Structures are given as structure tokens and as C-alpha cells.
């Protein structure tokens, strides 16, 4: 992409963010003179007390989003926006996984609101990844699957990542190998093997998602995995598994006897 194209994209992004900021300000201004402001403050306090006294399980999904949005745009009633967001994305999980640009496009939201939502996902993923990084992968397998599902199940494009492991199956690097369209991301055997050698990896785990939601491996997935496994075997690099993530669950090619 040339400089003019990059500049154009930057301008479009800036315009989208500016538009979102204006939307947040207008929403707040429209609600600042609301006669029910005292009720709103009381409602916020009750929501906060329920959270502190009984934990997150005491709140419905839209109430969790409502509370988050109150932190970003505190002068308005955020319940209608929260309900609209849950309805639009279908679930709290899908909302948290939505990309920032998609969030900013929603009525009443802007960069501040989007960042408030995304930081929750970032914190959740960081928490889920801790045991994966602290223990040998094969000893923390369920933790790995939980982390991968939280991170990838709701992606709208196909993403391929590779987990590179040392001889003790400790994670060396977790890298995105490629991203593609709705249902296609290229995986290049030579590049993955070369990267394994560069990192001194003794083993790898392949991971990719199916945006369709179906985690069952395709024939192409199986053939490509076997090709990488054969290439790695010649150089002493094991392919422990190929994990496929979908909204309906997770598939392991190793568990299915496909590698």
C-alpha cells in the first residue's frame, strides 16, 4: 500500500474515532438534564452494591455491560445501550471478543467505551494464559484449551497461530502465522519449520479457528497438518497437535487419531 493509501486509511480511522467520541459526548449531554438523574444514581449504587456483596454472578449479562459503560460514560443511563449491545452481538462473550472498530460503530459508543470493553477481555485472556505460560503445555492442556477458546472462538476471520515449545514442552513463543478471509488462511510448511529452527523449538502445536463455528477438521486441515508433521519429523521437531477452535467447541486432531 502506498503512502496515499496508508494516509487515507489513517484518516478514515481517525474520522471513525472522532465520530465515536462525538456520539459519546452527545449521548452524555442528552442525558445530563434527565429528571431521573437521582434515580439513575441510586440504580448505579444498587448495581455496585450487588456486585461487591455477591460477586459477578449476581449480575445479568447486560448489567455487567451496563456497569462497564457507566465507567466510560458516567452521566447517562447505560442500560438501554447495554441491552442493545447484547442483542446485537448475541452474548456477553461475543461482545467482549468484538473488535474495537465494530464496537465504535455501535450507537452511543466511542473509543472510550470500546477501550473499557476491550480491557476486560485483555485482563481475562491474561488471566487464562498464566497457567499456560507457567507450566509445561501438556500438563496444563485444559487451561490451554480454555484460553484458546476464549481468544479465538468468536473471531470473524480465520487465524492460524503456532505455539513453539522447548524440549520440556514449555512455551517459547505464541505467534500468529497468518490471517485470512472468512474461511481461508494460508499455512506455509516451510515458514513454520524455519521459524521452529530459529527459535530452537523441539515441538509445536498448530491452532486455527473456523469462523463458521464448526470445529470439525476439513480434509485440507488434515492434509496440511500431516505435511507439517512429516517435515518436522525429519528435523526432530514434533507436532504435538493441531487444535481447531469454533463457537461449537474445540477439536483436537491428536485426540481424533488424525496425526
Predicted regions and their residues:
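C-terminal extensions
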Residues: 13, 30-42, 56, 61-71, ...
Amino acid at each position: 500500500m502506498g503512502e496515499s493509501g496508508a494516509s487515507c486509511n489513517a484518516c478514515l480511522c481517525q474520522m471513525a474515532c472522532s465520530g465515536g467520541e462525538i456520539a459519546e459526548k452527545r449521548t452524555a449531554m442528552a442525558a445530563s438534564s434527565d429528571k431521573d438523574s437521582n434515580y439513575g444514581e441510586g440504580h448505579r449504587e444498587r448495581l455496585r452494591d450487588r456486585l461487591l456483596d455477591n460477586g459477578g454472578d449476581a449480575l445479568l449479562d447486560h448489567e455487567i455491560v451496563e456497569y462497564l459503560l457507566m465507567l466510560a460514560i458516567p452521566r447517562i443511563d447505560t442500560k438501554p445501550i447495554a441491552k442493545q449491545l447484547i442483542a446485537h452481538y448475541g452474548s456477553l462473550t461475543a461482545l467482549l471478543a468484538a473488535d474495537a472498530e465494530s464496537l465504535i460503530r455501535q450507537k452511543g459508543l466511542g473509543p472510550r467505551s470500546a477501550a473499557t470493553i476491550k480491557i476486560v477481555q485483555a485482563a481475562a485472556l491474561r488471566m487464562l494464559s498464566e497457567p499456560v505460560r507457567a507450566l509445561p503445555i501438556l500438563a496444563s492442556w485444559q487451561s490451554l484449551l480454555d484460553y484458546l477458546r476464549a481468544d479465538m472462538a468468536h473471531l470473524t476471520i480465520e487465524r492460524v497461530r503456532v505455539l513453539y515449545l522447548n524440549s520440556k514442552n514449555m512455551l517459547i513463543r505464541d505467534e500468529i502465522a497468518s490471517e485470512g478471509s472468512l474461511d481461508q488462511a494460508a499455512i506455509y510448511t516451510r515458514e513454520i519449520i524455519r521459524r521452529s529452527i530459529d527459535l530452537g523449538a523441539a515441538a509445536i502445536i498448530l491452532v486455527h479457528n473456523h469462523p463458521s463455528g464448526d470445529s470439525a477438521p476439513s480434509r485440507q486441515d488434515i492434509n496440511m497438518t500431516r505435511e507439517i508433521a512429516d517435515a518436522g519429523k525429519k528435523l526432530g521437531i514434533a507436532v504435538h497437535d493441531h487444535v481447531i477452535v469454533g463457537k461449537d467447541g474445540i477439536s483436537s486432531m491428536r485426540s481424533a487419531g488424525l496425526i
